[in-house]
Regions:
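Structured beta-strand/loop patches that form or line metal/cofactor-binding pockets in enzymes
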Residues: 1-45, 54
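Metal-dependent enolase-superfamily TIM-barrel catalytic cores that perform enediolate-based chemistry
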Residues: 130-216
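Glycine-rich, aromatic-flanked loop segments that form ligand/cofactor-binding clefts
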Residues: 106, 110-146
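Residues at beta-strand starts and edge strands
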Residues: 35-37, 68, 137
Length: 216
């Protein structure tokens, strides 16, 4: 057991992408830079753990505020009882944010606790969840916010250069022709395509039948 001594937010910003790239134009109104939000948990034994919350990319001050809301309910409690601390966070946030912003923050704090516990026990974090039968995990490239074929080819070329064999693209039902083209184009690079139907951007939500029809 090691009690939680302090919880704080760390916000970091850096240059990101090209100002004319479709992803920057569509998703980053402040231009080609990106912010990430981290939670730092300090245990009474002096060990610090870190976890990232994706909310920090888009609403860093909101992320910081939710961390500050939750921190007093966790400080002084056992940082090794991660499930109990997760339930504490749910009791604080579930009523007003069962999904969305608070979930990003809850996740970041939970990751930080896992990091701190694994460092204290001097073992890889995955061993806290049981052992592993694999010594490596295949990575994939995440992209596909492309308005032109040239942008898609640019991303495929980069993945090929890096030796990455899987490429996740984003799509909505109206993108069917673009998706069909990239599936065919990716074969030239021996790259497999995964399709993210962007459910978080769909209003109204895309139902399962629509997704199945899209795949067919």
């Amino acid at each position: 057991m090691s009690k939680i001594e302090n919880i704080r937010t760390i916000l970091l910003s850096a240059e990101y992408g090209d100002e004319k790239h479709p992803e920057i134009l569509e998703c980053f109104p402040n231009g080609p830079k990106r912010t990430i939000g981290l939670v730092e948990v300090t245990l009474e034994n002096g060990v610090k753990g870190y976890g990232e919350g994706y909310l920090g990319v888009f609403a860093p001050q909101v992320f910081k505020s939710i961390v500050e809301l939750c921190a007093p309910y966790l400080v002084g409690k056992d940082g090794f009882d991660i499930l109990r601390r997760y339930k504490d966070l749910c009791s604080i946030c579930d009523y007003w944010s069962l999904q969305g912003a608070a979930r990003h923050t809850t996740s970041a704090i939970e990751i930080a606790l896992v990091d701190a516990k694994s460092k204290t026990q001097k073992c890889p974090a995955y061993k806290l969840f049981g052992n592993s039968t694999k010594d490596k995990i295949e990575v994939y490239g995440s992209g596909g916010i492309c308005d032109t074929k040239e942008h898609f080819i640019e991303e495929l070329e980069l993945l090929k250069k890096l030796g990455i064999k899987k490429y996740k693209i984003r799509a909505v039902p109206s993108d069917i022709n673009k998706t069909a083209w990239i599936l065919k184009e990716a074969r030239k690079y021996e790259i497999d395509i995964g399709i993210d139907m962007c459910q978080n951007l769909a209003d109204p939500p895309i139902d399962a039948d629509d997704v199945m029809n899209y795949i067919k």
